[in-house]
Amino acid sequence: MEVILLEKITNLGNLGDKVNVKSGYARNFLLPQGKATAATAENVAAFEARRVELERLAAEKRSSAESRAAQLNELEITITATAGDEGKLFGSIGTADIADALTAAGLDVAKSEVRLPNGTIRQTGEYDVALHLHTDVEASIRLVVVGG
């Protein structure tokens, strides 16, 4: 199925690209989430009419993400959790806990933006946590987990 992308999608294309994708991917993911539209003649004409506005919105999202990344880079957050004698946590610290700690510090971060490639944190110590703010913008914070 041929679709027109309404935003940049990793490993697929940029705003305005006409791409061929499997029908299920288009029907179940791209179209319902507003990331693409079917490439019919009328949709192509409508997209070309809105292209400037969509590019401006994409640029605003990116600049907003870059300003957030500038605030977040080199930030250090401390989370206190109950831990045993050897530093093993009773429970774990996940993406929601990190996002809540950042929000409490006055920075707006969603849990879907926090990346923990090695899974949840189960030990006390210092960790570098990646934040995926936009398809082109990454930030990194220092997370300190202390036993309480």
Curated annotation (Swiss-Prot):
Biological process according to GO: translation
GO MF annotations in UniProt: rRNA binding; structural constituent of ribosome
InterPro entries reported in the protein's UniProt record: Ribosomal_bL9, Ribosomal_bL9/RNase_H1_N, Ribosomal_bL9_bac/chp, Ribosomal_bL9_C, Ribosomal_bL9_C_sf, Ribosomal_bL9_N, Ribosomal_bL9_N_sf
Gene3D superfamilies for this protein: Ribosomal protein L9, C-terminal domain, Ribosomal protein L9, N-terminal domain
Keywords: Ribonucleoprotein, Ribosomal protein, RNA-binding, rRNA-binding
Pfam family, one: Ribosomal_L9_C
Cellular component per GO, a single term: ribonucleoprotein complex
Family per record: Belongs to the bacterial ribosomal protein bL9 family.
Function according to Swiss-Prot or TrEMBL: Binds to the 23S rRNA.
Entry protein name: Large ribosomal subunit protein bL9
UniProt lineage: Bacteria, Pseudomonadati, Pseudomonadota, Gammaproteobacteria, Pseudomonadales
